[in-house]
């Protein structure tokens, strides 16, 4: 309960920081470009239940994104030939673009390194930046992005995000030096959140162990 509450608070704080950063960016005179000009959108792998195996290619799904980072608590593997174009790369952004729950649509995680034998499912999309930084990943978590995707309320009111919707999204494009500074600052904040979450998880486990010993 405490851990879940902390995760909600940290994500809300991060969203507030992102909104402040991108509002300031938007206030500057930077050129505005379409997202499709600076990133490629790659649809995921279609597979059948008979392809599922105990080993093979890891298929990233919506359950593999937890609190903005990759989670491997619920993994599915397929024994199937996967084209090189459907293998994740370092700094790819994986996004849930279709789900029965509208609240999961739009959630993202950054691929932190080159993960061998890893692809993504049909309800997911890889957004592969053409820029040499993680600026687009942070943009995809900002209110500026969500207000374009979910135009009515700024939150998910649809159950899918299509390439056509992404093609219409615009973002301010600062010079590379400014983008790298923004990316570095926001990424360092992500690291602090992740470290705090790990410490909290360890404390919760320690408390449970102590209670078990106490009431034996």
Predicted feature residues:
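Non-catalytic DNA-recognition/assembly elements of restriction-modification systems
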Residues: 15-16, 20-45, 168, 177
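A short glycine-rich beta-alpha junction/loop motif
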Residues: 117-123, 131, 153-177
